[in-house]
UniProtKB/Swiss-Prot annotation:
It comes from Synechococcus sp. (strain CC9605). This is Small ribosomal subunit protein bS6. The keyword Protein biosynthesis does not apply. Belongs to the bacterial ribosomal protein bS6 family. The keyword Ribonucleoprotein applies. Binds together with bS18 to 16S ribosomal RNA. Residues 99-124 are annotated as: Disordered. Pfam families: Ribosomal_S6 (PF01250).
Length: 124
């Protein structure tokens, strides 16, 4: 069984932007892809993490992962918008082959707590 290729874009936002603005970035880039004719498969906020090395004098960043598929033309539109944004300090888009992996849950998040509660309920 063959699977269509898809794209994964990981981008890092400045750590000092407010939570509402982070949500607006998630929505903005998702909507931009849809307008360009792509299908958004997954949009996950990975949270604030320490960077391996300082980027633009920042030691931390807010990581966001965006999985999408389309004809590839939408990637240029997305990356141009990210390049022009002062809030995005780094981005990378990679073409993936194979099936889309199951979404991972960040430990300590509401989704992780909900998974633990469901697992405990099914164990009883």
């Amino acid at each position: 069984m063959t699977h269509d290729p898809y794209y994964e874009t990981m981008y890092i936002l400045r750590p000092d932007i407010p939570e509402e603005e982070v949500e607006s970035h998630l929505t903005k880039y998702r909507d931009m892809l849809v307008e360009a004719g792509a299908e958004v498969l997954d949009n996950q906020m990975r949270g604030k993490r320490r960077l391996a090395y300082p980027i633009a004098k920042h030691k931390e960043g807010i990581y966001v992962q965006l999985s999408h598929n389309g004809d590839g033309q939408h990637v240029a539109v997305l990356e141009k918008a990210m390049r022009l944004s002062e809030d995005v300090i780094r981005y990378l888009t990679v073409k993936q082959e194979g099936p889309l992996p199951a979404p991972r849950v960040m430990p300590g998040s509401e989704a992780a707590q909900q998974q633990q509660a469901e697992a405990a309920a099914s164990a009883d």
